[in-house]
């Protein structure tokens, strides 16, 4: 089955900048997150699709490769998938194509020890952790430098020796018809060195599989889609080459009370209809504790109250966001006989559902309905 275009998956144009890509991903991730759609396999598949698209398009190098080659750019297995807690690093297109053309036209070169692969770790945070910042310990499996041979692959007391086939060049010349071409040495695989006495622990690879524990400091104000780079904490390189990096991908879990939009927080505050009509004070939650909200008389459902500075301070700096409380007027339930009687008396004092003085919107609505039916009968 053909893969969906990454730009279409996120609903953005090919010219979209990083901010637009992040905003689209955040909106879709909140919509299709498994926590919000338990048991929905279609939502889970969609979530994985947009996550994969985001991880490619937010990385400038991967995005450039995708724009040029499409999905074929990642079919060599180098980019890594989107599942699991961690994944492999990016493909080196210079190595993919350079080896082919180098062998044919004599441009082959001694193969240098490969830098270690980058790793990715998906970290879920609560809203409180994302807003305030947190330090978390994570455990990841990775290829680490062998502590016996210190990465050179040779048994202690010995060293890699010069390849007798290519004499350390890493290349050999071969005649093919009228042409003489250079190819990677089949004996040392282009490294110019061979290990005669391999390390007993890593068997000559210079690396061993280990799990390591890292302490990751998450700065205050991060949001879904943000990525934290830990330099040199990826997999160890081959035979002493530099290690790759670890990328911590942030995913903020849905909150039972608050919703975040950029640096602002939103919440719904239920009030009874008596307070809505008469006004009063009510306690509302913030991430810093409870505060009092003054509700004016004759407040209608849906009205937004802004509490300045009670939102999120962005990790990128700037002013702190606000908390916006949306009032929801609740209809009373489980009424006793006395309450029903009082409500009936109140309704009679209003003059019915279309009372002009006490319900101006209802009056306007019923006048509109009457005009509509009058027009139909003409």
UniProtKB/Swiss-Prot annotation:
Pfam family, one: DnaJ_C
SMART domains documented for this protein: DnaJ
Free-text remark on how the cofactor is bound: Binds 2 Zn(2+) ions per monomer.
InterPro entries according to UniProt: DnaJ, DnaJ_C, DnaJ_domain, DnaJ_domain_CS, HSP40/DnaJ_pept-bd, HSP_DnaJ_Cys-rich_dom, HSP_DnaJ_Cys-rich_dom_sf, J_dom_sf
One example GO MF annotation: heat shock protein binding
Segments forming domain J: 5-70
Binding site for Zn(2+) 2: 163, 166, 185, 188
Keyword Cytoplasm annotated: yes
Domain of life: Bacteria
GO biological process: chaperone cofactor-dependent protein refolding; DNA replication; protein refolding; response to heat
A cellular-component GO term for this protein: cytoplasm
Presence of the UniProt keyword Translocase in the record: no
This protein's name: Chaperone protein DnaJ
UniProt source species: Pectobacterium carotovorum subsp. carotovorum (strain PC1)
Lineage: Bacteria, Pseudomonadati, Pseudomonadota, Gammaproteobacteria, Enterobacterales
């Amino acid at each position: 089955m053909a893969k969906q275009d990454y730009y279409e998956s996120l609903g953005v144009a090919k010219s979209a900048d990083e901010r637009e890509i992040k905003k689209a991903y955040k909106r879709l991730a909140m919509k299709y997150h498994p926590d919000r759609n338990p048991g929905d396999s279609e939502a889970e598949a969609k979530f994985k699709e947009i996550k994969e698209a985001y991880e490619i398009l937010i990385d400038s190098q991967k995005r450039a490769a995708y724009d040029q080659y499409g999905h074929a750019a990642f079919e060599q297995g180098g980019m890594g998938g989107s599942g699991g807690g961690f994944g492999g690093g990016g493909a080196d297109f210079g190595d993919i194509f350079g080896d082919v053309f180098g062998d044919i036209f004599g441009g082959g070169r001694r193969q240098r020890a490969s830098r270690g692969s980058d790793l990715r770790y998906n970290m879920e945070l609560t809203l409180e952790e994302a807003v305030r910042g947190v330090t978390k310990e994570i455990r990841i499996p990775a290829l680490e430098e062998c502590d016996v041979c210190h990465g050179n692959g040779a048994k202690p007391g010995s060293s890699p020796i010069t390849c007798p086939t290519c004499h350390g060049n890493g290349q050999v010349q071969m005649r093919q018809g009228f042409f003489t071409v250079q190819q990677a040495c089949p004996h040392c695989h282009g490294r110019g060195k061979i290990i005669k006495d391999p390390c007993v622990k890593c068997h000559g690879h210079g690396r061993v599989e280990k799990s390591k524990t890292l302490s990751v400091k998450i700065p205050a104000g991060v949001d879904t889609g943000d990525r934290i780079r830990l330099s040199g904490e990826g997999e160890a390189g081959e035979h002493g080459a530099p290690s790759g990096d670890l990328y911590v991908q942030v995913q903020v879990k849905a909150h039972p009370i608050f919703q975040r939009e950029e640096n602002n927080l939103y919440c719904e505050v239920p009030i009874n209809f008596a307070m809505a009509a008469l006004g009063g004070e009510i306690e509302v939650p913030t991430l810093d504790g409870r505060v009092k909200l003054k509700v004016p008389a004759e407040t209608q459902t849906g009205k937004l109250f802004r509490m300045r500075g009670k939102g999120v301070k962005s990790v990128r700096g700037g002013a702190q966001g606000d908390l916006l409380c949306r009032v929801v007027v609740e209809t009373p339930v489980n009424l006793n006989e006395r309450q029903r009687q009082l409500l009936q008396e109140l309704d009679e004092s209003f003059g019915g559902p279309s009372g002009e003085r006490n319900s101006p919107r209802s009056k306007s609505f019923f006048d509109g309905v009457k005009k509509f039916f009058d027009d139909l009968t003409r």
